[in-house]
Structure formats: structure tokens, C-alpha cells
Amino acid sequence: MTQLLRFLLILSIFCDFSHSQRPTIRVGIAAALKTQNGSIGWAYAGGAVPLALQYLKSHGFVKDFDFEFHVEYTECDLTETVRAGLDFMKTKNYDVIIGPPCATPLIAMGTLSTVYKKPVLGWGFVSESEFSDMERFPYLTSVLPSSMTLGTVTSALLELYGWDRIALVYFKNELNYCSGVIEDVETSLYDENYSQMVQVVIKEEVDQNNTENFVATLQMIKARARIIIFCAQTGAEKRFYMIQAGKQGMNTSEYVHVMLSMRSVGFGVQSAVGKKPLNSGLAPIWEAFQVAPDGLEDLAKSVASKMLVIDLSSDIRDKEFLQYMTKNIVYAIREPPLSCMAPECLAANATGMGAYARHLFDVFYMYGMALTNLNSTDPNIYGNVDLLVSKFTTPFEGMTGQVQLNSELSRLPLYQVYALNKEYDQISIMNISLINGTAKVSLAYQNESSDVWHFWGSTRPLDTPICGFLGKSCPIPFFDQYRLLIFVFVIVAGLLILAIFTCLTSMVRNQRAEQSRLNSEWQIHAIKLRIPEKKGRRLSTDSENSTVTKSSKGSSSKNFETSEFNENYEIQFLENDLVLTTAHQVQELSNLDKMRLVKLRKLDHENLNKFIGLSIDGSRYLAVWKMCTRGSIQDIMSRGNFSMDYFFMFCMIRDIAEGLNFLHKSFLRLHGNLRSATCLVNDSWQVKLAEFGLEFLQDDEERPTQKRLLWAAPEVLRGSLTVSQMDPSADVYSFAIVASEILTKKEAWDLHKRKEGYEGKRGNSKIEIIYNVKKGGPHPFRPTLLTDSDVNKSLLALVKDCWSENPEARPNTENICKIILDMTPRTKDNLMDHVFSMLEEYTQTLEVEVDERTKELVLEKKKSDILLGRMLPKQVAERLKAGQAVEPESFDLVTVFFSDLVKFTELANKCSPFQVVNLLNEVFSNFDAIIEKHDVYKVESIGDGFLCVSGLPNRNGVEHIRQIVEMALGFLEFCDKFRIPHLPRERVELRVGVNSGSCVAGVVGLSMPRYCLFGDTVNTASRMESNGKASLIHMSEIAHAFLVDHFPYQYETNSRGEVIIKGKGVMETFWLLGRISMSNRSTPPVAQLKQLPQKCSSFTDTGTIRSVSPYIENASDSEDEELRRVMRREMMRVS
């Protein structure tokens, strides 16, 4: 690149030599070779002149001119500047002078230019406002604006953010650049045209070499200001300021450091070295680019984040040439036409260029443009300075941005205020231009908090801290000042919020609870539903006229013949009540569906079947309806065994119309599924509509059966309409079909008897009917109304109007109800009155029949009581009838009677079975008559045997022996007089045995209960009978003693002597001969018995307890023979 530049410069010189006739512009340059190398040093800035000349020629300027340059190193010395100026202007008469780059020497050079009328091009530290005085310096011009404009821009920034308390800090150096800038800024702040009064609390000049003094200044600023405006000439001074401010803790969000600059560098420095360059291509000022790394970059960076920079706009269009200029400026100065061979020029390297090199470039470029714009071939015209200077006002794009001078040869500046974004790259937050000395601010951000003050906590800093600069003037915190009020307010607000929250929570809870309660009303758990047990075809037995019977206690004793109920329903138990259920597919229920179910459950009308709820937790949805015990109209018609008169049918039709009218006026709007199967009948023969309002639930069947379509209106069949698409007139058509079923007392369309085929062919009658209905036409297909003669013709006409082919021609339900009301017979109010009037006709007949049956019942009860009393003791029978248990009872002393007909077997052989029965019946009947005259209980009679007892179950003291004796005598007296009709020569003889003692009595058995006696007394009485003689009363010793002791001299007895009794041994027994006053009988032939020895053999009876019906042994001839054998053996042994 260096070789190329050298070639281009030499080539341009040779080309210029080839045009010896062109005018030569002689340029005198007052430069500073050893002063401020980083800013105005000739080694780092002088190369801008040949580069500007090259740039002019590349853009078509100064083609007709040759240039001759003469450089004098006046540094910034006033004497050397005056000497060089006189030499340039007076002695050598140069056309234009450049420099010097310092303010004070430039004043002298400008004064000489006024005297000698030579244009002077100023650059470097020449921003003082006095250079704008055209009367004093008419030929001095510069591309740097006046520092007074910087003061105006600073004032505008302070006014924008409301800062009126500031500190001014500037660095001291040999050129006094910052002191002039600060003076102009301060002058602008106190300008009378400035509306905001700004207080400068501190104005201090600091020195980079005096750190202690600088720190003291910062300490004073901390105590008095938070908005600090400072001016630093070099990058090192800027970084020094940031480091020291950071060390003093001035990098918090309270501080704003405003840096003033007029070099178009912003947060950058003119250096080619940088770790991370800014978007302007310059190195950031916080980097240690001129010294060795010191580790303080982060500290400096923290202060930079709290900094704003006011600088000239750096919007350069030809950035590519600027980069070229930056890299080659130190090489260009060594080449012709300057050919600087000074050690400083030769030692310069490509680390960067001087800060004011771009201003030197622009001011020479402006001069070249002015020369060209004179547009004249007269060489003398270029000596017209006034005309030349007037051309300086032509605007152009330079290396410092847009350059435009006003009529006073002062640049019209465009300032920008820079800040750092979150990535620490500089951004322009506003543009400030000057129009007629007035600042015009143009903001470049949308949100001040986030775009400008993000490093300040998104809050604009104040010029005075709230708590003062020393933190001792903090206002009393609001909480401390109003603690009591706040405490009370918090409590009240808390209670209020708590109350509001409680109310809202309660409202929400109540609303949810109410919704849950409403949902629980229609939700029925599947576990509550159960299918009743079926016994055959019936659930239980009941009358033919009723399907459900409730007991008087209101229990669920219900029964129903399931085969006679419509197949659409399933009968189940809900708790203890029978209900009807319809099955539906499981699906998701929306909130609207749930609200519909709540409304549906509340729907109530006397002609609507009550919807109880929906079971949704089973394998299928079950809609639960109230049980209507008589089934549906379809069920009644299908049974065919019920007779209805006209009024009965009329009332049913009226009930259907009333229920349908109510539905049409409700939120449901229509029924949509009206059929005879959905018209249910309750106990009172009242019709109730069912299966309405659940069209959003899908049935188990995917599509309606053909039978259901028999009730559908023609327009519904043609369009396959859903319930939501139907019109109420479709219900009116269905009502007419149901009414035709009732009037004809037949199933819809008389389906079971239809035999015609479709188009002459035999086929499905349902399909034919549906097809004919859909077909329509002028004579639509309808059911035949063949009714009884007593049916009102107007009612038939109404039915025909209701099934009209045109839906609009059908009457609505309200008109139907009015027409039916007009047809109601005046003598009858309702169906139940009609039924009651029919029942009254049977009332009297039923009452007479009930009375007769009641009398018969009483009579039969008496008979049964008498019969039961004969079979069991009265008190025992009463306890058994009451369902009480009869405990066995022990009796201390009773008398037991046994009897037997002597030689009954021989007698029975002479008689037929019927004669035997008649004989026993006559004898025992007389015996029963005799028993009734005495206090004796007949235990039983088995065959010809007879068992009686006295003293139980009614205790009668000692009277029992006399009652048995009197009864026995009565039996003998009857037998003595009794004659057998068919055997007159035969006699009935009785053998009697009597014994007294203790006994146990009780009831044995359940199916045929018997009152039985237990104990040895009974066995002994039986032995007395079996060992007795015909027509004699054989008594035990105990019975005899009891009779003689208690009833002496009343009865005649005779000792039989000792007798061997089976199971008892030898016992002394007695004969009862009769009453003493009445006894004329001879003593029985028992003398031989008295001769028996007193000592007899004993026989042991192993069975001492007899059964209820003891076996009575026949002790007649065989026993006598055995007795004789025993007597003989004893007599022989004694002898």
C-alpha cells in the first residue's frame, strides 16, 4: 500500500510537470512537529494534506492547479508564528496559509491575514468563539465549530433532563484547549436566552500529573454535585478521569458524567489498537492503549457506563477512505509533495493518526473545492481572496461528516449525545442541531428508561440526591412519618381485603356448592340402581288391573309382569322404589348439557312423567324416570283386554295435548319423540309424557328403528331431521297418530293386521308405511279412523287436521287444548270422576257381599275355635294362636283315667268297617257328652282306647279324683244301657283303670301339635286298666286312699288284694263298686283272689315313662292264664 501511494504521488507530480502552463498554488504551513503528537503533531496529522489533494483530484477538483508546499515548524510558539506568517505573506506572498494548530498563535496568524489579505485555514485547537468574529478575522476559516455551540448544546441537554445543579471539571494543558471550551460552556449557561437557571457549584481545573489534587476535587464534587461536566483533551486524560472517579465510588446510579468533545470520536480514541473496537471503528476510551495493561479497565468501564458524551456527529459516508487514511497518514507525509524527513516523521508508525488530522483534511479539501468553483482561467482571479472565501460556504461530505459553513465562515454543527448500550457499544440517543443559535433536539430513543438509563436502574438520575449529598437530609420515610396511620390503614385494608376475599371465596364456594348440589340432584350413582329379581315372568304377584301395588305402610312391595311392559324401558329399583330407565351411550357432558339436566329435573307438570336423574358412572348412561305402573298406551293397546268408553279415550287425548302444550312453551320447545310408547299411564289413569329433553344423549341404537318412524312427521322422514332441527308442528303430527291409536283401540296403523304389499308385492309393512308417508301427495297416506259411534266427530276432525301434510296447516298445541276444552262434557270434570261414578254402581253390592263374607268368617272362626278347643286346652290354644311358645308344666296331683272296650276285636270282626266307625263314633260321642259334665280333660282316643285326666290343665284341688270317679261311673252306666243296632245281642263292656299322682303336660309337634302327659302316674293308670276286669273300675292304692280320705262314705270300694303288675311288681289295688246310696251290685267273684299269698314275685318294668300315646296292653284271657300259672307255682311252693 505504501509503494502504491508513493507511486501515485510521484505520478501526480510528473503529470503536473507536464502542464507547465497551469497556475501554481503556493501553500505555507505553520506546523507543530513536537507538540501534541496524538492530536496536532505534524508527523501524525500532516499526511492529511497530500491525501486531501489526492482525494480532490479523484473527485475531479483542482485538475488545473499545481501546488507547492512550504512547511515551517513554529510549534505553538507565538514569536515563531509571527515570523513565519510575515515570511509567508509579506516576503514570499504565498496564496494560502495552513495553521498554526494552536489558538493563541492562530490569533496572530489571523491578524496578519487581515492585514495582508491572505486566506488562513485553521485546524487543531481553534474552537474558541473569538475566531467567529468576521470583522476581526475576515479571511480566517476553519471546519471546527465554535465551542460556544458546544455550550448551547450542553445547556439544551441540561434543560431536557431538568438538571440545574452541575460541576465543571477540565484538564490543564499547554494549549489551554479545555479552559476555552469550559469558558464558552459557562457563558452559554448564563445566556439570558437560556430559560433554565443552572447553578455551577464547582468549577475546577485539574492536572493529570497531580493525582492528589484531582482526588480532592472529586471529593468536593461528591459533597456538592451529581451531574459532572468535564473536558479532557487526550484519551489518557479521559481514562485517568474515569479511573479516579471509579476509585472514589462515583460509578453508582446517582452520578452522570457528561464528557464534552468536538472531535467526532464519542467514546473512542484515534488509535488503531483496540481489543474490541466500537461500532465507529475506534478503540474505547477505557482501554489502556497508550500504557501497559494496568487491570483498571473494568473500573474505567464502570464509570463509562454512567457517562454521556456530547460530540460532533461522526456520520461519515466514505468510511472506506477514512480507514485508508488512518492506516497511511504517517506514510503520506514522507512522500512528495511534503517529503518530511524529520526524525519525528520517520519514527511515526501506523498505530493511528492525530485527533485533528481529519479536520486538516476537510479544511484543505474545502479550499480545493473553492479554487475549482471559481471556474475561471484568469490567473489573477485566484488572487481575489474575498471571492475565494465566499466559495467556502459550499457544503460537502468530509472526513468529519457533513461540512457546511455559514456566511460568517462558522461551521453549522450537528451534535450527537452518545451513551453505551447493554453490550457497551456506543449509541446515539439524540441529535442536536443549531438553527439561528437555537438548539433543536431530536430524540433517537423510544423509551427513555430502558434505552438511556438502563445502567442507572432505568431511572433518570437527579442533580440533587433525595437524602442530600452527604446522606443526612433524607426526608422522613413515609412509613416512619405516618406509621400509626399506616398501621391502622393496613389493618383496616387487610380486614377489608380479608372480608372481600372471604366474601368472594364464599360466593365462589357457594356457587360451586350450588352447582354441585344441582348436579347431585340429577346425578344418580349406579350402585343405587339394581335390577329386581324375576320370578318367572313376574317380579311378584299382583292383580291384573294394576302393575304395582304399594302396601299400606308405603313399603316397596311392588310387582310387575315384565313381558307386558314396553321394550324401551328397563325396570329397576332406585333404593326401595321401582323406576323406569332408558339406556344411552357414554359421552362427554358439557356445562350446557348439565344445566339442561338441572332444568329438566325441575320441569314439573301433571301430564309430564317426572325426570328423576341420570346415572353416568356405569358402563352406560341410564336416564331414570318415575314409574308409571300401568305401562304405556302402547302396552295397554297391545294387551287388548281393557275396555274404554269414549270419555276415557277423550281424557287420555286431553292429557297428551296438555303435556305437549306445556313442553312447547318450556325451554325444550318440543318433544321430538312422541309415540304411544312414550305416553305412560299411572295408577290414576293419568297420561304422562316421557323421554323428552334428552336428545343430546345418543341412544344405544345408532339410528331410530323403523317402528319408531311410524310416528314421525313426513317432513322429518324426508329430511332425516334431528330433534334440534324439528319444528313443533312435527309433535302435532305425532300427537294425531297417538290419538288415532286411542280412538281405534288398536296399535298405530293397525300394524299387526296389515297384509298389503308395496306396489302389489308382499313385503315389510313398516317400510311400506314409512314410504307412503314420505311420498305425500294430494291424498297423503294416513291411518284409518274406524271408531265407535259415540266418538265426537269434532274430535275426529281435529285429529285429521293435526296430521295434515302441510306443517303450517296443523293447529298448534294451544289451539288444540282450547278445542278439546270446548269438547269436554259438562257433566264430567275429569277421568277420575268418571271412574268414581262407575265404582259407585258397585259399592252397594260389594258392601252386602262383604257383610255376608264377614259373618261367614266369624262363624267359621267360632267353629275353628271350638275345634281347636277340643283338640287342645283353651289356654294352650290361645297361646298357640298368639304365636307364643307353650312350655311344659308340672302338676303335683292329678287323676288319670284309662279305658278300653273289652273284646272289641271280636266285636269288630262281626261288623263292616263303616259299622265299626259308626259304633265307635256313637260310643265316644256319648262319652264326650259325659266328659263335658265333669271337670275332666280328654287327652286322646286311639282306636277303642280312651285317655282322660282331671286336675290339669286347670288345677281343681282334690276334686280331680271325684270328677274321674263320677265320669267312670257314668261311662259304665251308659255301656250298661247301650245296645248295638246291628248286633242287638252283643253288649259293649268297658274296662277302666284309675290312678292318682304327679304328672308333666306339654305340647309336642308343630304340624299337628298334641297336648301330651308324661310321668309314671300315666303308666300306672294304664296298668290299672290293662289288669282290670270288664265293667269294673280298677283303682290303684293311691287313688283309693285319696278318694276315701277326701270323700269318705260316698263310694263303695273293695280291695282286690295284692296283684302282680307288669313293670311295678306286687301292688294292692281296689275295685270301685259304686256310690254308697246307689250301690245294689253284688260283690264280684274275687274270693279266689283273696286267697293269694301276700308274698308275690316282683316284675321289673324298665320303662317307667310312657309316651304321649302309650301302648295299651290287652290284659284279658292271656294275662289271666299267666296269672293262674303264677298262683299255682306259689301255692305248690307254700305247701
From Swiss-Prot:
PROSITE patterns: GUANYLATE_CYCLASE_1, GUANYLATE_CYCLASE_2, PROTEIN_KINASE_DOM. Its EC number is 4.6.1.2. Residues 545-837 form the Protein kinase domain. It is a single-pass type I membrane protein. It catalyses: GTP = 3',5'-cyclic GMP + diphosphate. Its main location: membrane. One of its GO terms (molecular function) is GTP binding. GO terms for cellular component: plasma membrane. Residues 535-560 are annotated as: Disordered. Residues 1-20 form the signal peptide. It is found in: Cell membrane. This is Receptor-type guanylate cyclase gcy-4. The lineage of its organism: Eukaryota, Metazoa, Ecdysozoa, Nematoda, Chromadorea.
